[in-house]
Amino acid sequence: MASRAMHDGRSVVTTCGGCYADCAFAARVEDGRVVAELPVPGHPCAARALCARGRHRLAMPFDERDRILHPMRRRWDGSGFDAITWDEAFAQIAERLLGIVDERGPRALGMTLGVPSFDRYWAYRFMHALGSPNVYGADGACEVSRLTGWEHSLGYSPASDLAHTDCIMYLGRSIVDSSTMGAVDALNDARGRGAKIIVVAPRRSGSAALADRWLRVRPGCDLALLLGIAHVLVSEDLYDHEFVDRYVTGFDELAQAASAWTPEWAESMCDVPAAEIVATARELAAAAPAAVVDAGFHGGIGIAYANSTQTARAICLVDVLLGCIGHEGGALNPPTPLVLGDLDPTRFATPSMPREPKLGSERYPLVDPMRGLCTTIGQSIFAGDLRGLIVYASNPGAGYGNAQAWLGILQQLDLLVTIDIRWSETARASDFVLPDVTYLEADRGVGTVVGANDARVFYRNAVLPILHDDTRPGREIFAGLAAACGVGECFDFTCDDLAAAQVAPFGIDLAALKERGWADTGMALPT
């Protein structure tokens, strides 16, 4: 499949590896470059076009600037790196990993993952095979505060029904500047049919420029603005009585607390004029329940401020007062998740789930323990609890807050291994650096899309063969490390074995799925 597009000019349906969105495109190789054909009719991730990031990613396989081309080992004097063989890399890394396990136990090992990465399945499996629970996603550097606030207020983070809303308010998020082309199109469609767009942002972003109302908030003070809006909704009796009476507990206590959140108080905190706060609250209420304060994403609402969790809870509060939860045009309930199949443990050796909690979970008990908090890695290193770290498709030395401090903390580890495509700040600070391949050079397996009434799966096909002989997909790297660590039996399966097991419950043929790029599961899922 990978060589088909490379050598005969035929198109291969795949998805972009630039972010979570998995925008679908049909790829072919033409004059030494990858050409993306869009849209892919019927594909659940169909997009009109790729965004700037997605277009840039098409050239990455051919761009050797800062590309890691061989396994590298830091010189003993720290003066640079030397290329080594994969066998040497696996053996030497395994020796040091097992040494840490023998001395401190498996909980002294950790891994932090970037996104997106299909090979995270192998990453988790590798750490679990060694007995370590410490696998951390990127949420802790992106949006864990927001997610925690929503999960402890509503149980989930809802999606805004932009297609049907009459009024939507965004905080700390600019769809125009940073989202998929599909999201930009949806926003323009909403404007075209008369929906009101309210943008809360300190600067005049692309979305603020086209908004009906731009609220120029003091950075980090969105919470005060939301509380001021809640005050108006309660004091002017603009909230949804039926929704509150049926679904809400503690409203009397809320009403009492809200009496202090006057628009004038909010103005003193967030710099948005009191009159604008009142007008915004009334505009949202007039459109409710087809009105919504968007749940947010990264940035200031995601994690950037000490009050980001409380800000997410305040967004939930306003949406509840509007009665828009689960309502068309409001904040949609999540659909029932689609559970993929898994490898048969009677055929494939499967590591046990570690019983101990992730390091850091005791300090932040509200954070989902399965998700973890990657930013606690530094605290665990400083305390001496974490001695070995694998960094996969991530860059704490630049992507986490206070990057210089992170680089200093990482130097305290007994072992630091980076697996990535290009040299990064973290890679340059590592003991070993292992070269990954770009997303176009390897199959990335099965993904899912669950809509309001149905569920589909799609396949992320490779477009190119591996262009540099000494680079390897993440799954092969973890399998090699596992074999060197004596747990290779847990990796005696292929990418196709896993993908076939994942779609088997739906009666989907893997070869047909790869050829078409997507398939219906035949399941009707209630929301």
Feature-to-residue mapping (PLM):
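N-terminal export/assembly segments and adjacent metallocofactor-ligating motifs
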Residues: 1-236, 273-274, 390-392, 481-483
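Residues in well-ordered beta-strands of folded domains
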Residues: 28, 38, 52, 69, ...
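Metal/cofactor-centered catalytic core regions of large enzymes
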Residues: 40-44, 384, 490, 501, ...
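Non-catalytic alpha/beta scaffold blocks inside enzyme catalytic domains
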Residues: 60, 144-327, 335, 345-348, ...
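A short, flexible N-terminal coil/short beta segment enriched in small residues
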Residues: 91-131, 301, 307, 311-346
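Short, intrinsically disordered, charge-balanced linker/junction segments flanking boundaries
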Residues: 289, 518-527
